[in-house]
From Swiss-Prot:
GO terms for cellular component: membrane. Keywords: G-protein coupled receptor, Glycoprotein, Membrane, Receptor, Sensory transduction, Taste, Transducer, Transmembrane, Transmembrane helix. Putative taste receptor which may play a role in the perception of bitterness. The keyword Transmembrane applies. Its main location: membrane. The gene is Tas2r143. Gene3D superfamilies: Rhodopsin 7-helix transmembrane proteins. It is found in: Membrane. This is Taste receptor type 2 member 143. Several bitter taste receptors are expressed in a single taste receptor cell. Residues 29-43, 102-128, 202-227, 282-294 are cytoplasmic. Residues 1-7, 65-80, 150-180, 249-260 are extracellular. Glycans are attached at residue 162.
């Protein structure tokens, strides 16, 4: 029987996940109706809709995976974990594309590459979404391969019928999945980080340039920079929390019945929840639909 703190954190995790599923479901419905009405979506809304759909699935998979692992359905949980890996990689790449889209559209740098991207980025979005799916699929294949190897190691060490890991299989899980995370997730994180840095410099240059003209704090371009930076600040917070949680999880053994495991889960999915709130508030269509509902 889990301890009282563990039960409390389990309930909090479940409530956060359900709230986030409702939130992302709202985004899917609003943008889905927009797509049905116009038979098309603006490029940025395509990315946001894809993010909302992926996050909706991620929370559902996280609930199912933790439920299965709690009852020692380890092989089933490992299969669901492969789906989690696919969705999570997809989300990381979609977040990187959204950051790049904001950077290209809003930044005021005069580099020829940025000029070219500013005119082409909207047409490139469908291809970028396809790249995200491909990277997610590749990540799932790597994860499935790791599960197969680890299961063979568990069987060879004589562990059957439960979730017990031998020393060799546990070390393999730690190093294999940490290497997998670095390989598959560092690139979108790097792209995301570079985009944020460019946006920050662009905002600083714009504010300094316009300060002499004193347009006031409601200058449209300054507002656009500020709104994008608010969204991307939450994005990068989610990234940092996620990677810290990944390091913690890769250096510990079975922690399902420890409240620290659930604290880590709450941190990860609360970050996603807060990130989705910023997406709703920064998107005119979603913000308008939210005001009409409430």
């Amino acid at each position: 029987m889990p301890s009282t703190p563990t039960l409390i954190f389990i309930v909090i995790f479940f409530l956060v996940s359900v709230a986030s599923m409702l939130q992302n479901g709202f985004m899917i419905i609003v943008l889905g109706r927009e797509w049905m009405r116009n038979r098309a979506l603006p490029a940025v809304d395509m990315i946001v809709a894809s993010l909302a759909s992926s996050r909706f699935c991620l929370h559902g998979i996280a609930i199912l995976n933790n439920f299965l692992a709690s009852f020692d359905f380890c092989y089933q949980a490992n299969f669901v974990g492969i789906l989690w890996d696919f969705i999570n990689t997809l989300i990381l790449w979609l977040t990187a594309w959204l950051a790049i889209f904001y950077c290209v559209k809003i930044s005021s740098f005069s580099h020829p590459v940025l000029f070219w991207l500013k005119w082409r980025i909207s047409q490139l979005v469908p291809r970028l979404l396809l790249v995200s799916l491909i990277m997610g699929g590749l990540s799932a294949i790597i994860s499935a391969t790791g599960n197969i190897i680890a299961n063979q190691m568990i069987i060879s060490q004589g562990f059957h019928g439960n979730c017990t890991f031998g020393h060799m299989s546990l070390d393999f899980y730690r190093y294999y999945y940490l290497s997998h995370a670095v390989l598959m997730w560092f690139t979108p994180f790097f792209l995301f980080l570079v985009s944020i840095i460019f946006l920050m410099f662009s905002l600083y240059r714009h504010v300094e340039k316009m300060r002499g003209h004193r347009p006031g704090p409601w200058d449209p371009r300054t507002q656009a920079h500020t709104m994008a930076l608010k969204s991307l600040t939450v994005f990068i917070t989610f990234y940092i929390l996620f990677f810290l949680a990944l390091i913690i999880s890769s250096t510990k053994s079975k922690t399902m019945h420890s409240y620290w495991y659930w604290v880590r889960e709450i941190i990860i999915y609360t970050g996603i929840f807060l990130n989705s709130i910023i997406l709703v508030l920064s998107n005119p269509k979603l913000r308008k639909a939210l005001k009409m509902r409430f």
